[in-house]
Amino acid sequence: MTDLTPREIVSELDRFIIGQKDAKRAVAVALRNRWRRKQLSDDLREEVYPKNILMIGPTGVGKTEISRRLAKLARAPFIKVEATKFTEVGYVGRDVEQIIRDLVENAITMTRDHMREEVKANAHQAAEERVIEAIAGSDAREATREMFRKKLKAGELDDTVIELEVADTSNPMSMFEIPGQPGMNPMGGGMDLVELFGKAFGGRTVRKKLTVAQSYEVLISEEADKLLDDEAVNRSAVTAVEQNGIVFLDEIDKVCARSDARGADVSREGVQRDLLPLIEGTTVSTKYGPVKTDHVLFIASGAFHIAKPSDLLPELQGRLPIRVELRPLTEQDFVRILTETDNALTLQYTALMGTESVTVTFAEDGIAALARIAAEVNQSVENIGARRLYTVMERVFEELSFAAPDRSGDEITVDAEFVEANLGALTRDTDLSRYVL
């Protein structure tokens, strides 16, 4: 669990997302409240429930990006799901309880990786012994083993090919998986058939030829797993989900039944009804045991283009008490997105062209022109936010990307003239830009 302060969380999010101060602050406070709750006495801790968040804003303004960055910051079990992927209980498809099962699976992986780090030193030693045995043989004298150990540590044996008995990781029962729902148990929480048969066929080993360098990763992973207590991993992961789990529910507006809607849309309310107990707090049965969702934090987001937040079921609105509105992006925001973020498209295209030995530099007027065109097309066609920059940049670099291998050593300056030459005609022809940009 992260112990960053709200100010630190916001400044970390600022590196990748421009603007949206309110949304960042709400998310930062929610994350910090997880840490605060852990400092309380046991009886009070049980009474403090998370305040779930509803983020409302047009497409392409940073809702999903906030969730993606939050997942890396949280250091807690985290899952991002689209509400549209789920169906009402009783219909074919995934029911909403699968969200918690997937969250537990993520937590198991995270906990296992964390615990592996703790036993890595011992696992490394055991892996070293197995490599030496594969090279020198099991009946080699201690002096011989010591000689190989020195060579191994010096990296002299990295390219030597050895034959090892390693665990067979292939799943012999994968053919029995349900199409479209890999590894999922149609019956809900218990152990699924694939896993059951997988365990029956488990414990098999195969002989593999690997170089010493390649074998280390495989062997360390195997030896670490031998040192881990599966029961402790599962227990720790379930506790982490119950106390610190975070679920990001994207596209929540797509399961709203609009007040004027008729027919199939109305059945979407079933998904909302199924979400109610999950968000309020219920017990979900998983193959690792029952999981209580009382203290899982839910962050829902939606564009609410057609539906309105008031079209959500009143009970669901009540379970998402913190409302945050994200504002549409302006031309000035686009300039900042292209220059200030750590993963700016300008940096990406410069690096991509650099692989072909083409040096690309962006002039200030070039960046301003890109931002202006993106903002204009958003206004005149459809406002898709920062995603418009992808389309504009791709069109500007289309010719250069194609010819780059033949232009090795060239230096290109992306200024207003370059942007105009590659995009000008399209932006002036509104009908054409409607389809191309």
Swiss-Prot record:
<feature type="binding site">
    <location>
        <position position="250"/>
    </location>
    <ligand>
        <name>ATP</name>
    </ligand>
</feature>
<keyword id="KW-0346">Stress response</keyword>
<keyword id="KW-0963">Cytoplasm</keyword>
<comment type="subunit">
    <text>A double ring-shaped homohexamer of HslV is capped on each side by a ring-shaped HslU homohexamer. The assembly of the HslU/HslV complex is dependent on binding of ATP.</text>
</comment>
<feature type="binding site">
    <location>
        <position position="387"/>
    </location>
    <ligand>
        <name>ATP</name>
    </ligand>
</feature>
<protein>
    <recommendedName>
        <fullName>ATP-dependent protease ATPase subunit HslU</fullName>
    </recommendedName>
</protein>
<dbReference type="InterPro" id="IPR003959">
    <property type="entry name" value="ATPase_AAA_core"/>
</dbReference>
<dbReference type="InterPro" id="IPR004491">
    <property type="entry name" value="HslU"/>
</dbReference>
<keyword id="KW-0067">ATP-binding</keyword>
<dbReference type="InterPro" id="IPR027417">
    <property type="entry name" value="P-loop_NTPase"/>
</dbReference>
<dbReference type="InterPro" id="IPR050052">
    <property type="entry name" value="ATP-dep_Clp_protease_ClpX"/>
</dbReference>
<dbReference type="InterPro" id="IPR019489">
    <property type="entry name" value="Clp_ATPase_C"/>
</dbReference>
<feature type="binding site">
    <location>
        <position position="18"/>
    </location>
    <ligand>
        <name>ATP</name>
    </ligand>
</feature>
<feature type="binding site">
    <location>
        <position position="315"/>
    </location>
    <ligand>
        <name>ATP</name>
    </ligand>
</feature>
<dbReference type="GO" id="GO:0051603">
    <property type="term" value="P:proteolysis involved in protein catabolic process"/>
</dbReference>
<dbReference type="GO" id="GO:0009376">
    <property type="term" value="C:HslUV protease complex"/>
</dbReference>
<keyword id="KW-0547">Nucleotide-binding</keyword>
<dbReference type="GO" id="GO:0008233">
    <property type="term" value="F:peptidase activity"/>
</dbReference>
<comment type="function">
    <text>ATPase subunit of a proteasome-like degradation complex; this subunit has chaperone activity. The binding of ATP and its subsequent hydrolysis by HslU are essential for unfolding of protein substrates subsequently hydrolyzed by HslV. HslU recognizes the N-terminal part of its protein substrates and unfolds these before they are guided to HslV for hydrolysis.</text>
</comment>
<dbReference type="GO" id="GO:0043335">
    <property type="term" value="P:protein unfolding"/>
</dbReference>
<dbReference type="Pfam" id="PF00004">
    <property type="entry name" value="AAA"/>
</dbReference>
<dbReference type="GO" id="GO:0005524">
    <property type="term" value="F:ATP binding"/>
</dbReference>
<comment type="similarity">
    <text>Belongs to the ClpX chaperone family. HslU subfamily.</text>
</comment>
<dbReference type="InterPro" id="IPR003593">
    <property type="entry name" value="AAA+_ATPase"/>
</dbReference>
<feature type="binding site">
    <location>
        <begin position="60"/>
        <end position="65"/>
    </location>
    <ligand>
        <name>ATP</name>
    </ligand>
</feature>
<keyword id="KW-0143">Chaperone</keyword>
<dbReference type="GO" id="GO:0036402">
    <property type="term" value="F:proteasome-activating activity"/>
</dbReference>
<dbReference type="Pfam" id="PF07724">
    <property type="entry name" value="AAA_2"/>
</dbReference>
<dbReference type="GO" id="GO:0016887">
    <property type="term" value="F:ATP hydrolysis activity"/>
</dbReference>
